[in-house]
Every structure is written in C-alpha cells, then in structure tokens.
Amino acid sequence: SAQRVRNIRKRRSISQEKLASMSGVSYGSIKRFETTGMISLLSLTKIAMALDMADELRDIFTSVPYRDIQEVINET
C-alpha cells in the first residue's frame, strides 16, 4: 500500500525526490501515489525494486485466487 511505501521510505530517511531518482519514477508520481494510492503497475514495480520490496510485490500477485464465493465468505 501507499502508506507502507511511505513508512519504509521515511524509516530509511529517503526523500520523495531521492526515491524518484533511485526508481526512475517522477517526483509527481511518487507524491500522488503517497497521497492518493494511485499509480501505474510499472511505476509501482520500479519503486518496489528501488526500496528492495520486490518480494512483497511478487507475493501480491502470486496469491491463490478464490475458487468460489463460499471461500470468500469463509475467510471473513
């Protein structure tokens, strides 16, 4: 999530400008992402790589999808 990225960035004392330079994602895109949570998949991937969070990003996309609505209901 955007909040998680912001927290990691701040914990590592990385400014939004520095993250932009590290990731190749524009400062405006990073600022917008941290404010609204909206970002392209490509930019999110670049940010994840720059912050060494690629494994977390991969985990999002490798989760097993639900087979039916009952699985969703059972999980809640």
Set out the residue ranges of the language-model regions.
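Helix-turn-helix DNA-binding elements, focusing on the entry/boundary residues of the two helices
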Residues: 5, 16, 27, 41-44
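Short basic helix-loop element that most often maps to the first helix and adjoining turn
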Residues: 3-19
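Recognition helix of helix-turn-helix/homeodomain-like DNA-binding domains
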Residues: 24-39
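Short, basic-rich loop-to-helix N-cap that marks the start of a DNA-contacting helix
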Residues: 36-49
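Residue-level marker of structural boundaries
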Residues: 39, 53, 65-66
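Flexible coil/turn residues that form the inter-helical turn or adjacent wing/linker of helix-turn-helix
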Residues: 1, 12, 37-40
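Short, charged recognition helix plus adjacent turn
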Residues: 58-76
